[in-house]
Amino acid sequence: MEKCEGVEVLSGLKQLHTLSLWLSAPVSWDNVSLPGLRVLHLRGEKNGDITPLLTSITYLHLEEMRKTEDLAAFLTPATRLQKLYLQSLPAVQELPALDGLPSLYALKLYELHKLNDLSALSHSHLRCFAASLIGDKLSAQALADAVMAIPNLEAAALQLADRSERRYGGIQKAFA
């Protein structure tokens, strides 16, 4: 198998539906066209400016971005986004505005320990919400209130609210 020096070679894959990236050095996506791309999984922070890839995706998975604090740059151009999975983002303290994503109906959060502001949920179009190991400093009541404030919520799963399960009983009471 030959080593590819540039990501431009991907432009030949017009039907490429799913792309998973974990690059060791930033690259330029300016000359890459992937009209069939719908699923994008980004791991790590050396993927370059992936804005050109975001316009057609419907599923975005962001993972292990240790220094990333603001997710707006990933979400604002992703106007067709339907499902979002945020995983192991230790610097994220608040969710960005979700009201500009009218097709976003499912959000899964995992290991966002510093998350302390979930107010964006109340202005979202979400129907499904799942979270595990988030908002270590949020009380059980604050977490439950944020979930209950999602206007069109049909299903929610809060598993392992924290590693010690100290908030689990409080969340159960709040939902009762």
Locate predicted features.
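Concave beta-strand-loop units of leucine-rich repeat
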Residues: 1-8, 15-50, 54-76, 80-93, ...
